[in-house]
Amino acid sequence: MKTSLRKLTLLGAAALLAVTSAAACSNDDSGSSSGDQSLEIVYWNYGPAAEQGNKATADAFMAAHSGTTVTLTPVTGENWGTYYANVATLIASGKRPDLMVISGEGAQFVHSNNLVRPINEYLDKDEEAKTITSDIAQGLIDGFTVKGDVLTLTYGWNDMVVYYNTAVFKKAGVEPPKPDWTWEQFQQTAKKLTEDTNGDGTPDRYGFTWASNEIFPGIMPWVANAGGNLTSDDVCTATAGTPQVNKAVSFLDQLIKDKVAPAPMPMSDVFTRFQNGQVAMFGAGRWPIATFLPKFKDFDIQLYPTGDTYKTVFGGAGYPILKSSKNPDLAWEYQKFTVSEEIEKQYVGTADKPGDSIPSRRSLARTIAQNGVPPANSNLYYDSIDKHETLVPYPAPAKYSAFESTVLRHLQLIFAGEASVADGLKNMQGELSSIVTC
């Protein structure tokens, strides 16, 4: 199933959720049902991959749990945000699904609107759960924890790492980056890789670029490594006007001014230019390898360079138990099953058909390299969250759709040279102040 951050966007739907929250509370069963062995699961139906992935998991669960029935309810939506709003409508109409698929960015949304049942009690009492969580990096637990409430186990996730074209590095005589490289070393490396082959003043190969249409593989690793975030720790206040954010955006803006990076572009264009050797480095999660392989293999990955600090930026997805569930105990068994070895193996993939996410189980993630799935440094995917500090919380307020579009719009003006970094961030902060609230 798709858990890449590039399509994780949310919608406020405040008026609707006022009704939905009440419906969820009135439907809340404090205990498990007796006799009923059925579950209904809602998921975002973004395409065949979503249908196939959810069906495979549901079929496997029913095969492993005789007598159970799992009904899958696909919910449409242009993005995660409209999907959430449509699920809210479903519950408000009286439907009682047991679980729903959410992205990590949706944690604040579902928690603030009282839609989900935290799993803290299950984690404390279930011995099998203790075995499972011991095999999951703490950062993945923290990513779905809001005000002490653990909302769900993460079945798959992506982190932000730097991809580099190994053929371009070799041709330019540049050594591969090391895990402890700094912003200054990154800048020097990008300059060495930038080349104007025809002397027209415009580089034919740039050292680095980033996505214009996404926050997480765009500015967030730089903001995190400058020691900042776009929201306060309680995700109640925008912090775009802080010195840390200014430092990160200024660094990227200078790359453009120095002509070692073009103006940021959509991620699909980044993929194309990277494979063509027109861009030497870019940032993303594991999902690009599904596009690259099996034809393109001249790539490897490394951590983002360290600034004032280093923090891994990541996000994942899970199946939280809804308060509308009539069978929460069975729903918990299903949630556990989504992180079982049987299911997690599908995220490993093969060299010809790799998974587009990282398994949440440490033991399964380690088999990516063992199975020969590129890149060579694939152990870094899990090490980035298992051995390094992470950016928590997600800068993802309940009104994430408005938040994201506002951030990207002002960044576009800055990187196009239509606004200075200081003025652009000041205007961004002004708009976000009414969007990021609690």
Residue ranges of each PLM-predicted region?
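Extracytoplasmic/periplasmic solute-binding protein
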Residues: 145-155, 160, 170, 184-237, ...
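Conserved C-terminal helix/tail region of periplasmic/extracytoplasmic solute-binding proteins
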Residues: 170, 176, 386-438
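Conserved N-terminal structural module of periplasmic/extracytoplasmic solute-binding proteins
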Residues: 2-113, 127-131, 329-330, 342, ...
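Hinge/lid segment of periplasmic solute-binding proteins
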Residues: 105-159, 300-303
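C-terminal lobe and pocket-closing loops
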Residues: 124, 288-296, 308-314, 321-406, ...
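Glycine-centered hinge/linker elements that transmit conformational signals in sensory
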Residues: 189-190, 234-264
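Short, solvent-exposed loop/beta-turn-alpha elements that line the ligand-binding surface or hinge
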Residues: 120-136, 179, 198-209, 228-247, ...
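Short helix-initiation/N-cap motifs at beta->coil->alpha
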Residues: 75-86, 105, 181-187, 262-276, ...
